[in-house]
Every structure is written in structure tokens, then in C-alpha cells.
A protein has these predicted regions:
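A short beta-strand-to-loop transition that corresponds to the Sensor-1 phosphate-sensing loop
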Residues: 1-5, 59-62, 107-112, 158
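Conserved two-lobed SF2 helicase motor
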Residues: 99-115
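A short beta-strand element within the Helicase C-terminal
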Residues: 107, 116-130, 152-154
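Interdomain hinge/linker at the junction between the two RecA-like core domains of SF2 helicases
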Residues: 2-48
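The feature captures the C-terminal accessory region of ATP-dependent helicases
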Residues: 172-348
Length: 348
């Protein structure tokens, strides 16, 4: 937000360049950056967390918070704005008090940004389910390390393309009335009149995301700062649609922070692969065991009725140093002679 304001002020000459100062952001306290993909993986990450360590989970909406409350229950605190459609959840003093987390887990929205600092050495895990790099930097900045030993790990939830597309479409839905009104204010009244013919125009206007209503004049004006913010988000979402979540984050965030994101690993799966290495197993059994130990979600969409194949499973387990191969049983007296099985083998 601040960068957009500063850029606008520089363009208009309000903000002289000689009054501009750059303060570099430091991320030396971040020791690891991990990617995960679904709720089950996050629950497993929490399960692997040492009992004396704490976690903050930044989510996109109250709906996400309600979903995680089913997993974490009273073990976590839940904080969102009181202006939320569903109202407030836990009061801030039951979430963060005197800069210290009050429970082992805090699930929160971007409402935590507003001047709330966390100076708690036990906070070792920050989970990010947001997508905008500006919001993410703000979220990470809530932790204020008290010394060089006060470090933490980051976890990013990879977002599917469908979510990115839906978010872009919603952003453009909010943006449309403001952009039409700007053109109206510049003398192009026909653009505004054309927008008013849309069946969704009344709803878009009533939301007042990019418009401000004046009771005095009985008319709307374009909210130029809101429009600038949404244009910025729209550009980012279009780039993310094109590159994919992980490549976008690498270009827009991780590289500038000196981070390399790695896929989440689970010791349970690591131990399982080591134990079954070399054994001929039924495809169905091995598939089910790997999915359970690795918290791998079943396929969705058009592929939801198809079992995960060898290619997909190998993509998941190669980071552990293993892969699945076909092997036919040619044992002379074997009751399964001639049948093909799956075998977990160690990568060379």
C-alpha cells in the first residue's frame, strides 16, 4: 500500500525525491521456507511441531478460520476484524498480550497487521495462506526477533489455478464500476452509461469498493486509491495465472528475501518408504499407504474418480530419494507368478 502511495506522489511531484529514504528489510531470522498443498498437510505439520513452539497461521477469510477451528479447537486462538460479516472471534488480548502469543496456535486474517507486534521467541512457525506479496511481507513482519537466536520457519500454501482465476475475476468485478466512473469524470459519460446497463451494475455499485457516495450531492465519485490498489492486485493475479503460484512467488517474493521454497516432508512417509523398500506390493495397498503417510490429497475435478498413478506418486516421493517401479513376479513356485507389482526403490 505504501509503495503505491509513494509512487503516485512521485509522479505528481507531491513527494520530492530528496525526501525519499530506503530502509532495507532483513530476513536473516528465517531459517527455512516450505511449501504445502492442503489442510491435511498443515495438520500434520502442526503434529510434528515441538510442544514448546508456537505457530501463527495467516488465512484469507473468516471462513478459513472456521474451517481450521474444526481441526485445532481450543488449542488455537482466532482473530479477525470486528467489521467482518460474521463479527469478531477472540478478543486481541486473548490472542496476543504484551507482544506474546497466548496460545500455541493463532489463526488470523490480515486484521493482525494493524500495529500488532509479536516479540515471542517461542513463535517458530509462520504459515502463509495469502497470495499478495505486499500482504505477505506485512504478515511476516509481525514477528519481531529479540535477538539473533530468535528464528522461525515459513510455510506457504500453494494455490491452484482455479482459485487464482476466481480471485482475479472478483477483483475485476470490484474494479469495473470505479474505472467506468473515472472515465465519466473525465468527460466520457457514455462509458458510465454503458456500465449501468449491466445486470450486475446495481450490486457492484452498492458494494462501494471503488466508489464513494456523497449524501450531499447524491452521486458517486471514483475512489482513486482503491482503484490503484485493485489494479495492482489485478496485474499480480494475471501474472500468477500465467506463471503459476510457485513461479510467481519465486519471482515476486522469495528471491528478494533470499529464500528457496522446498516441498513439505513428513517423517512418517520417510520411515514408511525405508521400511517397504524392495518389497513387491499390490498397487492399491502401496498407493493407500503412501497417500496416508504423506497426507496426499485424492484427485479432484475431472480426475476425482481415478486413482493416483505411478507418475503422480513418484513426483511426491522423489524428494525422499525413492521412486516406484513395476516388477513382475517370476518366482517358479510363486502363487502370484506372472503378476505385476509395484516396488519402492532407492534413487541412484
Amino acid at each position: 500500500t505504501a509503495n503505491l502511495m509513494f509512487d503516485s506522489w512521485r509522479r505528481t511531484g507531491i513527494f520530492p525525491e530528496e525526501n525519499s529514504y530506503y530502509l532495507p528489510q532483513e530476513y536473516d531470522h528465517i531459517t527455512q521456507c516450505t511449501l504445502y498443498y492442503n489442510d491435511k498437510e498443515l495438520v500434520e505439520i502442526v503434529g510434528q511441531m515441538p510442544p514448546d513452539e508456537k505457530m501463527v497461521v495467516f488465512v484469507k477469510s473468516r471462513r478459513d478460520m472456521e474451517r481450521y477451528r474444526k481441526f485445532f479447537g481450543d488449542e488455537a486462538a482466532y482473530f479477525c476484524s470486528s467489521n467482518n460479516a460474521g463479527g469478531a472471534m477472540d478478543p486481541i488480548e486473548k490472542c496476543v498480550n504484551d507482544c506474546v502469543l497466548q496460545k500455541r496456535i493463532l489463526v488470523t486474517t490480515v486484521a493482525l497487521y494493524n500495529g500488532i507486534d509479536i516479540e515471542d521467541p517461542a513463535l517458530k512457525h509462520i504459515v502463509i495462506e495469502l497470495w499478495d506479496p505486499t500482504d505477505i511481507r506485512q504478515a511476516i513482519g509481525r514477528k519481531r526477533p529479540i535477538n539473533k537466536k530468535d528464528t522461525c520457519q515459513l510455510y506457504f500454501r500453494s494455490l491452484p489455478k482455479q482459485y487464482i482465476t476466481t480471485t482475479r475475476e472478483k477483483t475485476e468485478y470490484w474494479l469495473e464500476p470505479g474505472q467506468a466512473r473515472i472515465k465519466f469524470e473525465a468527460g466520457r459519460e457514455s462509458i458510465w452509461q454503458e456500465f449501468l446497463k449491466k445486470p450486475t451494475a446495481d450490486d457492484q455499485i452498492k458494494e462501494e469498493v471503488t466508489l464513494t457516495y456523497s449524501p450531499t450531492t447524491g452521486s458517486y465519485t471514483a475512489d482513486k486509491m482503491a482503484i490503484a490498489l485493485l489494479r495492482d492486485k489485478d496485474q499480480k493475479l494475471r501474472k500468477m495465472e500465467k506463471l503459476g503460484y510457485e513461479k510467481f512467488m519465486e519471482e515476486e517474493l522469495w528471491s528478494s528475501m533470499g529464500l528457496t521454497a522446498k516441498k513439505v516432508r513428513f517423517k512418517k512417509l520417510e520411515d514408511y518408504l525405508e521400511n517397504v523398500q524392495g518389497q513387491m506390493m499390490q498397487k492399491e495397498e502401496l498407493r493407500a499407504q503412501i497417500m496416508e503417510a504423506g497426507q496426499i490429497a485424492p484427485p479432484t475435478g475431472r480426475c476425482k474418480n481415478r486413482p493416483l498413478g505411478q507418475i503422480v506418486l513418484n513426483r511426491e516421493i522423489r524428494q525422499y530419494g525413492y521412486e516406484i517401479k513395476d516388477r513382475t513376479d517370476w518366482g517358479r513356485n510363486s502363487p502370484t507368478r506372472g503378476k505385476t507389482f509395484w516396488v519402492v526403490t532407492k534413487l541412484q
